[in-house]
Amino acid sequence: MSLQFNSVALLLVALILLGIFSQNSAVTISAAVLLIMQQTLLSKYVPYLEQYGIKIGIIILTIGVLAPLVSGRIALPELVQLINWKMIVAIIAGIVVAWLGGRGVTLMGNQPVLVTGLLIGTIIGVAFLKGVPVGPLIAAGILSLIIGKS
């Protein structure tokens, strides 16, 4: 199998370099894995990754968020501790972000052309603002509110 020199491969190489330059391992590793998959026999699995990647990523992210509760590093708050303004705002923020993420998934499925812009914005945020790549779903949810689509 020979190497494929196409615009996607060049973009992935650019993302790897951007990830290294910005010291963001999430971008570097993600782009490297996808480049390896694209350039090898693993390319046949890309459609499965495309179909189930977000769902698997959300599951892994949720496991990572819940792990400190299970390990005991973070104690489950007593009911009385839940009744303060910071905790209430945190709960509301969680509800809003989950709702926006749901709208974002729908928008990305219905208007896939917008995914490119969302990805570019997310990559810039991850690379230069030390963000994490959960942005596309929330960004798509916010975009759906702005353009009136879901």
Swiss-Prot record:
Subcellular localization is given as: Cell membrane
Signal peptide region: none
First-listed, main subcellular location of the protein, grouped into a coarse class: membrane
GO cellular component labels? plasma membrane
Q: Which Pfam families match?
A: DUF441 (PF04284)
The residue ranges crossing the membrane are: 1-21, 27-46, 52-72, 82-102, 123-143
Q: Does the keyword Manganese apply?
A: no
**Alphabetically ordered keywords of this record:** Cell membrane, Membrane, Transmembrane, Transmembrane helix
Cross-referenced InterPro entries, in alphabetical order? UPF0756_TM
Does the record bear Transmembrane helix in its keywords?
A: yes
Membrane topology per the entry is:
Multi-pass membrane protein
Q: Which family does it belong to?
A: Belongs to the UPF0756 family.
- Protein's name in the database: UPF0756 membrane protein HAPS_1649
Which species is this record about?
Answer: Glaesserella parasuis serovar 5 (strain SH0165) (Haemophilus parasuis)
